[in-house]
Amino acid sequence: MSKKITLACAVCSSRNYSTNKNVSNQSTRLEVKKFCKTCGKHTLHRETK
C-alpha cells in the first residue's frame, strides 16, 4: 500500500516535492537531499504529515 507524501525543505520549510511511499516497507520518515528553488541550493528535504 503506497501513501502520497510531501517533502519539505529543512532550511526554509517550503514544500517543493510530492512522491509516493510504501508504508509497509518504510516506517521511518523519508529524508532526501534535493534542490530547493527557494534556497537556490541542494538541501535536506524531510517527509511532512
Curated annotation (Swiss-Prot):
Which residues form each disulfide bond in the chain?
none
Pfam families on file: Ribosomal_L33 (PF00471)
Record bears the keyword Lipid metabolism = no
What are the entry keywords? Ribonucleoprotein, Ribosomal protein
Instruction: Provide the leader sequence positions.
Output: none
Q: Which domain of life is it from?
A: Bacteria
Task: List this protein's GO terms for biological process.
Answer: translation
UniProt GO MF annotations? structural constituent of ribosome
Q: Which InterPro entries match?
A: Ribosomal_bL33 (IPR001705), Ribosomal_bL33_CS (IPR018264), Ribosomal_bL33_sf (IPR038584), Ribosomal_zn-bd (IPR011332)
What Gene Ontology terms describe where this protein resides (cellular component)?
A: cytoplasm; ribonucleoprotein complex; ribosome
**Similarity comment text for this entry:** Belongs to the bacterial ribosomal protein bL33 family.
Q: Can you name this protein?
A: Large ribosomal subunit protein bL33A
Natural source organism: Oceanobacillus iheyensis (strain DSM 14371 / CIP 107618 / JCM 11309 / KCTC 3954 / HTE831)
Q: What is the lineage of its organism?
A: Bacteria, Bacillati, Bacillota, Bacilli, Bacillales
The gene behind this protein is rpmG1
